[in-house]
């Protein structure tokens, strides 16, 4: 019985696993999320991302596609709305010079209905900007 409880507990913990260790031969891109928003890794170079929490890419040029979900406050909507309107958007970020062993950070936000994304290097220098690739209401 104890073995069964221990095994069940370990299986539950495995589902809550943290991020893997970065591969030093790849570039690692962290996704920075904010309260009440969601940012997910979708694609790298038209291939589905294996993990929605980060990107890991070989050195060189790549196009990253992310999904960004965010609320638009009623004050930005106008009219009788009292609840936020949720937007579900995709953004594309291209960068030509990912380097092995380097960590990057992709940050997203919005101004009213318009989403934005920026890619930062380790020195917090902006090295890429996101381009909207479509939005819808949720």
Annotate the PLM regions.
Residues 16-138:
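Short loop/turn and low-complexity linker motifs enriched in small/turn-promoting residues
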């Amino acid at each position: 019985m104890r073995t069964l409880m221990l095994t069940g507990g370990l299986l539950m913990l495995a589902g809550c696993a943290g991020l893997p260790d970065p591969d030093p031969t790849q570039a690692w891109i962290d996704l920075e999320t904010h309260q009440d928003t969601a940012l997910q890794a979708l694609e790298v170079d038209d291939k589905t991302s294996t993990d929605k929490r980060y990107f890991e890419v070989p050195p060189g040029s790549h196009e990253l596609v992310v999904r960004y979900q965010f609320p638009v406050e009623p004050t930005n909507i106008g009219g009788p709305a009292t609840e936020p309107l949720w937007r579900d958007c995709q953004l594309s970020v291209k960068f030509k010079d990912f380097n092995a062993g380097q960590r990057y950070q992709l940050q997203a936000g919005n101004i009213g209905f318009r989403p934005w994304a920026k890619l930062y290097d380790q020195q917090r220098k902006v090295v890429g900007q996101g381009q909207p690739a479509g939005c819808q209401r949720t």
